[in-house]
Amino acid sequence: MNIKDIGVIVAKKPLKENTFIITVFTKNYGLYSGVVKASSKKSKFIYQEGNIVDFLWMARLHEHIGIAKCELIKSYTGYFITNKTKLYAFNSIISLIKELLHEREEYSNFFSFLINYLDNLSKKFFFRDYINFELALLDIAGYKLDLSKCAVSNVKQDLYYVSPKSGRALSYEVGKPYKDKLLILPKFLLSDNSKITLEEKRQALTLTNYFFNRYLFHNNRHAEARQAFMEYILHRCHPAT
């Protein structure tokens, strides 16, 4: 059977000399892995993580790993390699997709979201966009956070906490008696115009990290590239964007 689709390469592992196993996040079929041969310098460039490609997968049976061929549509390497912040963010989102999404499940809406994010990241890094990407990833994984109103009173003002059990927002007054057991809701997630402080970045990464660890990272497994991104962002001062 054959599958042909547009996709983003999210992993590349050496198998033997000039032969690799690549994993591609496709628009209509989700994650697919296949064996590729890349002997020339040009072909090796095609199979870099983050490249958007025309993807052809061929196998006798669906459950086989298959043979893959790709034609390059767009490479982001030049946009990210010279900017550390962009590179850390890029590596993080690619690793999260590889670690958290299920093989051969369709995520077409999220694929479009990813392409849009990569295009925006190639122009400029915004921390707000990055956190929105992580929230969207939690959503498609089945753990959407409801930050629109207080889970108890339904008010939309003075939201301050997030319940670690329900993933829903709580107002300051409702959550105050239980504050030691709650997560902080960063102010910038409630307003598009607010500047983002370093502490709010820490709060936001703590928030998404909690739900990643609770529901999606099992057996102490985690995305190392995301850990590196967190360390970089939280230990260096960047403009509040």
Swiss-Prot record:
Pfam family, one: RecO_C
Keywords per UniProt: DNA damage, DNA recombination, DNA repair
Gene3D superfamilies: Nucleic acid-binding proteins, Recombination protein O, C-terminal domain
GO CC field: bacterial nucleoid
GO biological process, one term: DNA recombination
Listed SUPFAM superfamilies: ArfGap/RecO-like zinc finger (SSF57863)
Function: Involved in DNA repair and RecF pathway recombination.
Family in the record: Belongs to the RecO family.
Annotated protein name in UniProt: DNA repair protein RecO
Gene: recO
